[in-house]
Amino acid sequence: MKKNKLFMALMAGTIVISGCAAKTDKKEESKTAQVNTSKGTKEQLKQATDLYKKFVENQVDTLLKDTEKFAETIKAGNLEEAKKQYPVIRMAYERSEPIAESFGELDVNIDFRLADYLEENKTEEGWRGFHRIEKIMWEQNTTKGTEEYADQLVKDIKELKAKVATVEVTPDLMVTGAVDLLNEVATQKITGEEEI
């Protein structure tokens, strides 16, 4: 009987120790999996942010070239051609907006709507960028008066290009910018408020 009790106690101890060892192994496997997943996720995020930054740099390059051409068209007084170029140029800016918006004042100089500018400044004085040019071309049906704004827009986009080249694109910046843009689309662009 004592032998059976001793045998049972040894067996129970062995089972408990084996069970604890198995749990430790599972914990170690779990930690290793978390570390591997974490490393993999970080690498994937780095690849995604690097690709997105490259995409935005390409969009800003296109934006600058197209805006320079647009400024020349405006200075030549070719209203119809300028009106054709305008929405195409805007698309390149919109695609870079999740990062461009992070440059505060520069985004305001390039892409601020009149309604928002008036709300903040109580005057049109100092308002410039795409929407200033747009207002003159469509409301006054002319390119006259847009030349200085077009030149300034080119300068602002050159500054944007320089800043985009040096910005660190983090997952937070990429996601926050995208969410902000989606909110803007939902509250302004879809409803037509973007054009006010």
Residue ranges, per PLM feature:
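Mature extracytoplasmic or organellar-lumen-exposed domains after removal of signal/transit peptides
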Residues: 33-196
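Non-globular terminal segments
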Residues: 2-13
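Bacterial lipoprotein signal-peptidase II cleavage site
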Residues: 6-7, 17-32
